Amino acid sequence: QAAVGRPAGKYTFARGREAGGEVFNIVLYFQAKDEVRTFVIEYLVLDAVRLHTDVAELYWQFIGRNRSVDTEFMSVSLQLPPGAQAEEVRLWGHGPLRGEVRKISGEKLWWETPFLPRDRYLEGRVVFPPRLTPQAKVLTGRAALGSILAEEQRWADQRAAEQKQALYVLAASVVCTLLGW
């Protein structure tokens, strides 16, 4: 049995606001002891695309931080509307350093991480031709690709610096171990 009022195999869903944005919280109720559990959560997102004059943009946090448990493996599959060539679509992932981002086609995109600590998030950003979402309701009236590319480059540079620093710490640890310090 799960906790009182929280039957195993059920879930709750709530909408809220956090840090200036809308948040969707799903709480899954389950029991597990020395076992692996897999959860598949599928949902359709409406009105999440921002339509700029030069690109359409989807920027979405797939799973937030501050969960009660770590996630051993997480993957996200995103299906864009048909009509774009792969070279017209750009995508990025934000979250753990070990994550992977793949463009399978102009329509199918994939994010994956082998381990997501409870205090880390996984989000994705995609830009694609505006013609794919002519019905988008969030219109910015400005060009955005240049600023998006610049922002993503800054984050990539920051990530590279973090990886380099982690490598230096690892190398120093190995040297200290070899020297018996």
Predicted regions and their residues:
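Hydrophobic, helix-length membrane anchors
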Residues: 147-181
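Alpha-helical transmembrane helix bundles of large polytopic membrane transport and channel proteins
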Residues: 1-16, 41
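Surface-exposed, acidic/Ser/Thr-rich flexible loop segments
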Residues: 17-104, 117-118, 122, 132-138, ...
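Short alpha-helix capping/helix-loop boundary micro-motifs
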Residues: 108-110
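Structured, non-catalytic alpha/beta "coupling" segments that mediate domain-domain communication
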Residues: 125-128
